Amino acid sequence: MARITVEDCLKRIPNRFQLTLAATYRARQLTAGGTPQIELDPHDKDKPTVIALREVAAGKVGLEMLNRGQA
């Protein structure tokens, strides 16, 4: 299992406050049954927050998470 660092995520979303919000929204989606957008190892028992951060670091999730629910 590769470790995820905040620095990896900050390369994608430079503002740490926006990063926190985007990862939180995505983690909530995953908790509610959302499908992960990255490939997961079936042996890893990563929490939704870790999966969300991995998605941000991989570029699969970004600032579009902050626009959820807005028309």
Swiss-Prot record:
Reactions catalysed: RNA(n) + a ribonucleoside 5'-triphosphate = RNA(n+1) + diphosphate
InterPro entries xref list: DNA-dir_RNA_pol_omega, Pol_omega/Rpo6/RPB6, RPB6/omega-like_sf
A biological process term (GO) from this entry: DNA-templated transcription
Enzyme Commission designation: 2.7.7.6
Record-linked SMART domains: RNA_pol_Rpb6 (SM01409)
Keywords recorded for this protein, A-Z: DNA-directed RNA polymerase, Nucleotidyltransferase, Transcription, Transferase
Cellular compartments per GO CC: DNA-directed RNA polymerase complex
GO MF annotations in UniProt: DNA binding; DNA-directed RNA polymerase activity
Function in brief: Promotes RNA polymerase assembly. Latches the N- and C-terminal regions of the beta' subunit thereby facilitating its interaction with the beta and alpha subunits.
Protein name per UniProt: DNA-directed RNA polymerase subunit omega
Organism: Azoarcus sp. (strain BH72)
